[in-house]
Amino acid sequence: MNLSQTDAVDWLSTLKASSVDLLITDPPYESLEKHRKIGTTTRLKVSKSSSNQWFDIFPNSRFEELLTEIYRVLKNNSHFYLFCDQETMFFIKPIAEKVGFKFWKPIIWDKVCIGMGYHYRARHEYILFFEKGKRKLNNLSTPDILTYKRVYRGYPTEKPVDLLEVLVTQSSNQGELIVDPFFGSGSTLIAANNLKRKVKGNDISPAAHEHFEQRQKSHSMQIHK
């Protein structure tokens, strides 16, 4: 497992072209700022100050350079998954298509528990499913609604490892390289490692690295090279 702590786009630019088998990520997208200002999301849990200690927002203005780098580093015939909300989905989709990706569909993560808010309170999140070239999913019977209860073990945007294992299993094989440029709580890294994939991850936040280091220790992770 190879981890870095720098800007996501800068880090991706250091990876070789067509070297990555699968990329899964959950960037701290711009609309999160709106939610944490008005306190309508349990993803940010306590307060604006408590979420600020974990991550800085990645602005919409930088998504084209990010997606361009993601497309460059992915091998032909590979998949790319990005977690986001509805507002960000409408923004990202045309940019991803512009840089070369085929957009298949939004997969729904059903969190089981309802979130905070005022108008039809959300209990789901989107996982945008993109493809570079053409790659068959490993299990064609998997539905597009994935139901896994939301977890919170100290990191505000943590994803269930079981959920990430579905994506890793669907779009990669043992020994292939999985990359996450915004690894956050580290769930993607753990899922990939559990399934004996190679892993490279990056997050600019010192708090994310500290959290993941403690998570590794508490789970006594056996790192697969």
Model-derived segments and spans:
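Core catalytic lobe of class I
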Residues: 1-210
